[in-house]
Amino acid sequence: VTASCRLGLIAQGGAGWMGGSEYIRNLLHALAAAGNPEATLFCFQNAVDDWRETGVQIAPVQPLWQAPLVDRLGLNNRHFAAALRAHPVDFLYPLTYGNRENIGLTFPLRRTLRQTRWAGWIPDFQHRHLPRFFTPAQAAFRDQGIARLLAEAPIVVMSSGSAADDLRAFYPDYAGRVEVLRFATCPRPEWYEPFTGSELASIPERFFAVCNQFWLHKNHLTVFRALAILAERGIRPHVLCTGALDDVRDPAYPAQVRAALQQNGIADQVQLLGLLPRRAQIELIRRSVAMVQPSLFEGWSTVVEDARVLGRPLLLSDIPVHREQAPPGGRYFPAESAEILADLMANAWENWPAGPDLAAEASARNAAGIRLAEVGRCFLEISAPR
């Protein structure tokens, strides 16, 4: 990419999907690490303050007109088109099947984007692998949105080789457009400094950390069953969970989580901390004995990358993408085997010290800088004219 190539990124995520906003923040840091710090961030006008700390130029987009006819006529696209005229870029990323919620765009996109080069992003194909977690309407929304995206996207970015293989299998006609961008966490300097916040004032000295939103596929219940097994052996570790207690796909799930704590007799061992500020979440991971990542499915796991840059060991579900991420110090268990997870947790609880491990952090921090620059260079190659 030449110095004159202007890059535009579209805001993702928010309180309902923290992984999306971290994805964009880390990509901005990766570009800076690769020597290309200039970018324009497109976000809704009411989200500008959420992104101001990134320091990049922000292109605000007027909010949606909420009316079905407006969508059918593509009138909301005019708001994004106006922002793009005011802040022109040469390459725009990521366009997704959730564009309407992220930035107010509906398909088709040709008239809106005109000559701007762009790439689509499909985080994963979870609805194909775990259809039991989706209603027919939810699965159809994803399938239809992905089909519309693929019909127009000149490039489709996937976050892992595993996800790219899925796209080639499910949509073989589009295999030639696939690029893989494995993202990385950018460690901030303050993460390695003494923590001064009050959010962790009442936590125990030793604990396992589980840092996932409370969605069904994140598989918290297997962790709770493992704790029940350990309790029968007289081993009672603490587990601290972060993440919003809210699953839009299954609103009853948070109640099931709380009920499981009572039914398994582990309510006094598990703290549900809710959605913590990012710095407090990072400190929680630093201090943990290990992070437990029990997810049944991921496109690429942000929390695995977080643990990597903090030098913390992980107990991970044995799913293809976790094997692909291959974090140092990872120990794997079959995703729904509470028994094997219990064995791993018992060994870690009895033999591993709590963090932080300053030597491991220093090594991980150095490796993270190299890894981040590689991500930035990979993105610059994807965005280059072809």
For each predicted feature, which ranges?
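Carbohydrate transferase catalytic cores enriched for Leloir-type hexosyltransferases
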Residues: 1-386
